[in-house]
Amino acid sequence: MQFIDEVKIHVQSGHGGAGCVSFRREKFIPFGGPDGGDGGKGGDVIFTVDPNLSTLMDLRYRPHLKAGRGKNGMGKDRHGANGDDLTIPVPPGTIVKDAETGEILADLTEPGQTVVLLKGGRGGQGNARFTTSTNRAPKFAQPGEDEEERWLRLELKLMADVGLLGFPNVGKSSFITKVSAARPKIADYPFTTIKPNLGVVSYKNYRSFVVADIPGIIEGASEGAGLGHRFLKHVERTNILLHLIDLSWIPDRDPIREYETLNRELALFSPELAGKEQIAVINKIDLPVVRENLPSVIDWFKERGIAVFPISAATGEGIPTLLDEIARHLWGQAEEEW
């Protein structure tokens, strides 16, 4: 399924139904009183969170959405039917903004959460409601209220506990495959991952957490380079960031410089992002070239007070210890300490 995380749509609530002008016409009562019923209420525009959705793709191809119009009132005091509500399902993490002003109208994060964004117009009153002591046969009724309409911009920011960062081809997809049931595309070239992947990690004693594999970020990402800042927003809701580092490219690539570059891009995009807690994860320690350079790189991180964990996504070495550390950050302690 195509991953779409931004759409612009036009939504419109339902117009209220008109009140009815009607008079009783029954046998032996040729001049009965007014019996015009009220019009029905127009449908509302409602957003609801569907946990089974992970993209805004369906809305991309339906840019104009409209709730049902209320039916007009009828004679014999019959009320017009209310218009059908327009219910729009969205994935968890969807932000609804006014497309013109950028105002945030709703932040939808919890499964089942609903918000009424536009109210349908009220139905007009029928002439039966306007009878007075001086006007026993009113020949007028109210029209229904107008509908509301608005252009909206929807943005999806994935809901994950852990954000997985790193330059292209450092092994993020291999890592998420190893620790979860997610199966992202994996190959030995940059930008294999062109959409965020979510993996649920089943931890000890039936606890679990969600990891988001964010597509490779390069220098200039905050300004749109590479896959750009489009995906940086997906780490904003995470509690902790794992920064994967690959030493197998030495000397062609400098892993320390890449680490500093990525953090600079985070800071340029959002100072709050740069301030999130990070764990440095050195991947591919099953390779001789990585083990050779491992001590000096570990020392570099430790000198700066940065937690660092060597692992192999290929063999699984070091991963249980890393998961324990993640658990401490998320829940305050590792499972065996409970």
Curated annotation (Swiss-Prot):
What are the binding positions for Mg(2+) in this chain?
173, 193
The UniProt annotation places GTP binding at: 166-173, 191-195, 213-216, 283-286, 312-314
Q: What class of enzyme is it?
A: hydrolase
Q: Which residues form the Obg domain?
A: 1-159
Q: What is its EC number?
A: 3.6.5.-
Keywords of the record, alphabetical order, are: Cytoplasm, GTP-binding, Hydrolase, Magnesium, Metal-binding, Nucleotide-binding
Q: Which GO terms describe its biological process?
A: ribosome biogenesis
Q: Which InterPro entries match?
A: G_OBG, GTP-bd, GTP-bd_Obg/CgtA, GTP1-OBG_CS, GTP1_OBG_dom, GTP1_OBG_dom_sf, OBG_GTPase, P-loop_NTPase
One Pfam family assigned to this protein is MMR_HSR1
Q: Where in the cell is it found?
A: Cytoplasm
Which cofactors, if any, are listed as required? Mg(2+)
> Do you know which SUPFAM superfamilies this protein is assigned to?
Obg GTP-binding protein N-terminal domain, P-loop containing nucleoside triphosphate hydrolases
Claim: GTP-binding is one of the keywords in the record: yes
The answer, when asked if Oxidoreductase is one of the entry's keywords, is no
Q: Where is this region: Disordered?
A: 66-91
According to the UniProt entry, its GO molecular function terms are:
GTP binding; GTPase activity; magnesium ion binding
* Gene Ontology CC annotations of this record: cytoplasm
Where does the OBG-type G domain lie? 160-331
Q: Supply the CDD domains for this chain.
A: Obg
How it assembles, according to the record, is: Monomer.
Q: What family name appears in the similarity comment?
A: Belongs to the TRAFAC class OBG-HflX-like GTPase superfamily. OBG GTPase family.
Q: What does this protein do?
A: An essential GTPase which binds GTP, GDP and possibly (p)ppGpp with moderate affinity, with high nucleotide exchange rates and a fairly low GTP hydrolysis rate. Plays a role in control of the cell cycle, stress response, ribosome biogenesis and in those bacteria that undergo differentiation, in morphogenesis control.
Protein name stated in the entry:
GTPase Obg
Q: What is the native source organism of this protein?
A: Geobacter metallireducens (strain ATCC 53774 / DSM 7210 / GS-15)
